[in-house]
Amino acid sequence: MKTSIFKSLYVQVLTAIAIGILLGHFYPELGAQMKPFGDAFVKLIKMVIAPVIFCTVVTGIAGMESMKAVGRTGAVALLYFEVVSTIALIIGLIIVNVVQPGAGMNVDPSTLDAKAVAVYAEQAKDQGVVAFLLDVIPGSVIGAFASGNILQVLLFAVLFGFALHRLGSKGQLIFNVIESFSQVIFGIINMIMRLAPIGAFGAMAFTIGKYGVGTLVQLGQLIICFYITCILFVVVVLGSIARATGFSIFKFIRYIREELLIVLGTSSSESALPRMLDKMEKLGCRKSVVGLVIPTGYSFNLDGTSIYLTMAAVFIAQATNSHMDIFHQITLLVVLLLSSKGAAGVTGSGFIVLAATISAVGHLPVAGLALILGIDRFMSEARALTNLVGNGVATVVVAKWVKELDAKQMDDVLNNRVPANKTHELSS
């Protein structure tokens, strides 16, 4: 029995995270040296993200009967993203005003090390809506795949899928080749995922060894407040959306538990992207919907990042005694509605977006970013986990709204009545 338990990726990753925490705490110098293991795993995952998105989107679109369905799916997805991410921003704003984790700190901004955040402030200057939209268009197809820019690859894949669909029977050979290539890529992903425990161990050992548990204690109130808010958002907001769509958020979380642990260990929701594409399709969502919603959601539907941005900005104001009345906070909300999309496609961009927002708002000290620089790494876990669950729920919701969801398949899989690797034929 024990052997079968430890063959589970879920248990292996959980054990690796625990060992990483212990090593980082008791042997911090050694723990900090484990960083290459985490970096290597994330790089391996990033290596296959572009081809898996391309194959999934192309075969999904080219295999559809009507191209109008693709446009409808995209429009519904963007509407959902905007509404839910706005709710996340507002919830973060309300909670941080009620709890006030930064009140009483009385930090003088002039005493903070502005140099520590200078690099983030500099990067933030390049993050704008126009720059973001232009960046979606790749300089070359090869460049899009080489850089691993999700939105650039997605744009090319959508255009390729449309063009292949228009070829009709003439494009069948190309379609078959891409579908076979997709199976090869998922085979590579299965091999890479065997290294997930090593990657999670290295990333967690580095985090604890580098920043220490002491960092958590110093600004613990903000961290606890943020984690509780993320949990409430998942259970209450996403839970209500899930219930209205016909499934349990808790059963869904159990279904993607391995992906959640991988994200917890690496602090990167991108590390689970390839597996999420596969799992959401096996859950009963049509491939074309999964291929559009998941990659787009990684830029437009980052609920955890939205909560973090409003909470962190107001926390800095509270800690530095910077006055923020209701008009300032509404301005902050409006700016975040734009800036949170402007850099969301960049991995680990939460801190950069925060720097861009504070610079744009104007009346908050940029040096105040130094207050949360040390704990940002610890908050990234909650951000990434919430983002992952949010994108999974979004995929099911959009699939149901556009009538591309096999409800029976979803119900059977979530209730363990049928293995997730068995799928029913989805009716058109």
From Swiss-Prot:
Segments passing through the bilayer: 8-28, 44-64, 76-96, 142-162, 184-204, 222-242, 289-309, 326-346, 352-372
Topology relative to the membrane: Multi-pass membrane protein
Family matches, as InterPro entries: C4_dicarb_transport, Na-dicarboxylate_symporter, Na-dicarboxylate_symporter_CS, Na:dicarbo_symporter_sf
Molecular function per GO: fumarate transmembrane transporter activity; malate:proton symporter activity; succinate transmembrane transporter activity
GO cellular component, one term: plasma membrane
Function (record text): Responsible for the transport of dicarboxylates such as succinate, fumarate, and malate from the periplasm across the membrane.
Cited HAMAP family: C4_dicarb_transport
Family of the protein in this entry: Belongs to the dicarboxylate/amino acid:cation symporter (DAACS) (TC 2.A.23) family.
Protein name stated in the entry: C4-dicarboxylate transport protein
Organism: Klebsiella pneumoniae subsp. pneumoniae (strain ATCC 700721 / MGH 78578)
